[in-house]
Every structure is written in structure tokens, then in C-alpha cells.
Amino acid sequence: MSLAELGEHPGKVETVTQQGTYLADPLAAFTHLCQNKPNALLLESAEIDSKDDLQSLLMVDAALRLECRGNQVTVSALTANGRSVMPLFAEHCPAGMSVETITDGLRITCQPADPSLDEDARLKAASVFDALRLLTKHISALRSHPHAVFLGGAFAYDLLATFEHLPDVPEGQNDCPDYVFYLAETMLAIDHQTQTTELIGSVFSGPEVANSYFAVSQRLEHLQQALNSMPTNSAPTAGSATPADVSVDKSDEAFMQDVNYLKTHILAGDIFQVVPSRTFSLPCPSPLAAYAQLKKQNPSPYMFYMQDADFSIFGASPESALKYEKHSNQVEIYPIAGTRPRGKRADGTIDHDLDSRIELDLREDNKEKSEHIMLVDLARNDVAKVSRPGTRYVKDLLKVDRYSHVMHLVSRVVGQLRDDLDALHAYQACMNMGTLVGAPKVSAATLVRQVEQQRRGSYGGAVGYINGNGDMDTCIVIRSAFVKNQTAYIQAGAGVVYDSDPLSEANETRSKAQAVISAVQTAMQKEQY
């Protein structure tokens, strides 16, 4: 299809690609290309046991930014290329959604969820997910490429309240919108197994397609040149602030009171398990430098750095939120519950004998096992909601994964996605992951809001991507920091069951937060010295 024809046919995307020099250090490339640039995203994956890098996806330029708050989605065109996509929203928005033109974008308003509908009807009703779904469904690629249409970003924990009735609570310091996603215009895909780098540009059809094609092609050339001339040391630099003490929004004593209060609801039969949390905070003048330290100190299966105009989110998460692969049609949840500190000597090195004894203690702890099995059952129920009958099963049960400061009990639940659903339906049905809420999910989420008395923001939500093929890969936002106004907010929770020890649960939140706290502090100390 010629550029002239593309100008008359909205809803198409032409992919422009170039092969680049292999980038063994994607963070250095991100720092070089995007250090002070909003609407940029770095997603990195690693093998669980070896911690070897697998793939890095680096979004340099975004065409659109989509922000959801409650039942409204604001779509902002960031480039002329992005403006070409805007007519699709008015053309394809489902019934029950209104589209209003605003400065540089659109405001889409959805009807509130109807509680009288059954679970399946609610899942298929028009919702804020349709703004994302529309882009993956109604933009067709002229040439096959998995990332021709690529949406990367974050779902907040509080998106759940758009679909379930939860107590109203105010914003906390972590005021991440219900979701923020970017539609990629230019990005890098780095495969660490084959040691290849691909530069990808997406040109969307519409009246400005000729100019957009030229602009995107030129941008890829500029990126290629920038990468070829990248300094040998492009590590992010930290700020000059003096390392400060860590503050916490809830003392050990207050958190222990929350645990005891929640245990009364467990004993009353209202819930089986619940995951309260608290927030640690400290100065973070350079979140990118802190992420570099976290990646070095605590490599994890999912590592991410999201740079918005108003905030940054970074983390090294051990836990998948929801994963869906179109080619296999498999939907997957990877529940993690049950935690112990690593066995370390006084100098911080791993004592392998002590470490193995701690693992045995974890595996034989009835409280930890009961907590984990409850969450596996919850994951089984969630996956069953969206799977073909008879295809859901537990692929792995009660394995142990190790990280820098802690080890975890893990399992894996999979199923074959129903033909009438997609990855966004699956995420909606499963959010939020039970390991961050409890069971039953809505009752536990209600009690979480009662004790925490504020929205969680990004913590306990998910970061990842959806592409035009229909694939989704997301991780839970844990072992993470939300950074705003040079302050990092690091939230961590603990699973509470009927025989939980309140002090142990308080200590667990500290253990879980420690890797991120250490990374922020180390980044500051390196600058100071």
C-alpha cells in the first residue's frame, strides 16, 4: 500500500525497522537516549534461576499517552503520528462510552460497572479497558511484526475500585493514575540470547502519514547514530543529596495492631487471608541511578523503569501478574507467597548451609504453606474464569525462588484462554493478584482499605505491555519505588492468616522493602563519595 493510499485508510500501521549493534547494557542506552525524557519506558526480563538477561524492550518515543482515572480515560497525542490514531476512538468506541475532544486529545467516559450483571456479562461490558483494546484490535499491521502496535505502561492497584465496590479513601503519596500506557512510536527490542538489537518505528496511517513516515525514519537514523556514538560509560548519575534516614508511615506497633485487627476478621470467617502493607520513604534525587543499583544488587525476572512527566516507577519484581501468549493461547499466573530472609554471614555473603536450612524451614512451615495454598486456589479460580473448560491446571507447586535479600515459595497456574476473550479480559478478571490482596478478594480488598486508609497507587498493580498480536506480559509492582518530587515511596506487605505472628509480619515488610531501600541509599552514597 502506497503512502498516498495510507493517507486515506486510517487504522493501519507501517513498521520501519533497522538492525543495530547489540546492546549488552540496555540501561546505559536508556540513560543515553531518555534520561530526562517523559513518556519513556524500559522493560527487562531475566531467567529466574541464573538471573541471565533474556530480553529488553526500550520505548524511546511515544505517539499517544493514555491515562485512566475512575471511569474516564484521557488520550493525549504526543506527536503528529499519534494524531493520526485519534479518529479510531470515535469510530470504534463501544456503545455506552462517550468521546469528547479536548486540547491535544480526547476524553473518553464510560458508564459505571453495573453490579446487577453476572460475572461474565460484567467482564464483557464496555469499560476503560476498551481504550487500550481498541488500539490493539483496530490497528492492523501492513507487515507482520510482534511490536508493530506496542502499548507499555502500568495498571494501578486501585483500578480494581472501578469494577468492585470498595470504601472511598483519599490519594496517598503514591498517586499513580488507575492506568498510564504509552503507544510506541520508536523503540528498541534487544534479545540477549541471540545478541541482537532491533530499532522499530511505527507509522500510523492518516492524512499526515507521509510526514510521519519521514519523521519516524529520520528518528531511527538519529537513534542509530546516538547509539553508535554512545560513551563507554553511560551509567546514570545520582543526585547530590546526603543519604537520609528512612521514614515509615506506620510504626511496627501500629502495623501489629492492624494484623491483630485483621485476624479477628479471619477468625470471624469474613476472610481467609489478607495482605496489609505500609510505606517506607526516603530522598531519591536520581531514580534512574537507584534503579541501576537495584538491578545490580537484586536481579529479578522482571525489571522495569517507567518515566512519566510527573513521576517515575522502578522495580525488580519476582512475580508475574498476568502473562498471555497468543501463539500458545496460554494464560498464566505465578503466585508467590511465603518468605524468608537469605542465609547470610556477617559480611553479607551467602552461607549456603544456613541458606538451605532456612529453605527447609520455609518448606515445612505450616503457616507459610497454608497461606501459599490459599493463594494457589485463588489463582486457580481466577484462571478458570477465563479458561476453556478443563484446561486450567497447576503447572508448578511449592517451588523456591531466591533473590538478594529473600527467598519465596512459588507456584504456576495456567489455562487456555476462552475464544471469546482476550488478554485484557483476563487481566480484568484476575486483578489484583491475590498475593497482594488476599482471599476472598473483594472482602480482603475492603479490609485493606479500612486499615491503610489511602489508595495504594502503583503498588500491587502491574507494569508491562500489550501488543497488536494480542500478547500480554506484566509483573506485579512489588520490590519497587514510586518516585515523585525527589522522594521514593517503597511499599511492602505481608500475608496474614489465622496463625500469623504480628511481629513477624511487620519484620517481613521490612525485609521485602530492604532491597529497594538499599539501592536508593547506595545510589546516593556513590554520588557523595
Name every feature range the model reports, one short phrase each.
Residues 1-529:
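Extended alpha-helical targeting/anchoring segments
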